[in-house]
Structure formats: C-alpha cells, structure tokens
Amino acid sequence: DHAAFCARLNRGSLVAWGHAGRGADLGPTLPALTDIVSVCPSGYAFAARRADGRVVAWGRTADGGVVPAPIAELTDIVTVTGNGYAFVAIRRDGSLVAWGGGRHGADLPAPIAALKDVVAVIGNLSSFAALRSNGSVVAWGDPAAGGTVPDPIAALTDIRELTGNHMAF
C-alpha cells in the first residue's frame, strides 16, 4: 500500500497503521477477526483471506477496498493477489474472481474468466498475469503495462514461474 501498513498477528488477527482512508482504518468488524491466513495490498487498499476460504477487504473502494457481495459470499478462495488498483483471487477450481479498478485488472476478459486451470497470479501497477497448469500464461489489464501477452510468449507451455516489476512482466 502506498500510504498504510498492515500486519497479521500470530492469532490470525490484523493491525494496521498509516493513512486511514488508504487501509489503516480496519473499521468496526475486522479487528475482531481471528482467522486471517494471508493479507495483500493494492495501491490504497488491503484484502485478506480467511481460514474458511472467504475474503475481506478495506481501504479505498475504487482500489478494491470493498469486496462485491457475490465474491464476499464465496468460501473457496485459495489465494488473493493485488496490483496497484485491484485484487484477483484464485478459487479452489482454478478459476478467477476480481474486484477494484476495472480497467486495471478487475474486469476479467471473458476468455480469462472462463479458465479453470490457474495456479498462480501476479500483479504489477495496472495489470495481472496468470500462470496456467499447462505452463502457459495469460494477462489482462493495461496493455501498456503487460496486460497483453505477445504471441511468441503466449505460445509457450513450459513457464514455471512469473515475476514482474512496476510496469512489465
């Protein structure tokens, strides 16, 4: 986060500090949770995965600080990843859900929304890239920041790890 910090404690609870509107304000209900297993930032929000596979978020709404109701009801989230403006979560079946800044990765293109074999996701400032179980990669979000995979890379099926920087993968 660009203006706040968050820490997950041994007991599965959270503490946060910094700019209140950018993720430091946990609100009235989040401090009582004791089942947080992971937490990640977007630019101005945080998302946390709970032990039961649900996800919660807080911070700036436009950057993913509110989980849409259909996603908040899910109980099969296995990982959550943020970029500068959005979050994406992998579900147990290898599919994806996303929320936050739409043009920066929260709007999943139909072919990517239909996938059921995603094993890892990484984000940069305004795009996401996902590794599939067949060793291929897909990306979406801002094309100028790696949100479109070049054809020679899209044809690869032996990718084992993804990494990115601020504006590229």
Tell what function each PLM region has.
Residues A4-A7, A16, A45-A48, A57, ...:
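Conserved core positions of repeat-based scaffolds
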Residues D1-H2, N10, S42-G43, A51, ...:
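Short loop/turn segments that connect beta-strands within the blades of beta-propeller domains
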Residues I159-F169:
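Short, intrinsically disordered, charge-balanced linker/junction segments flanking boundaries
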Residues H2-A4, G21:
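Short polar catalytic/cofactor-binding loops
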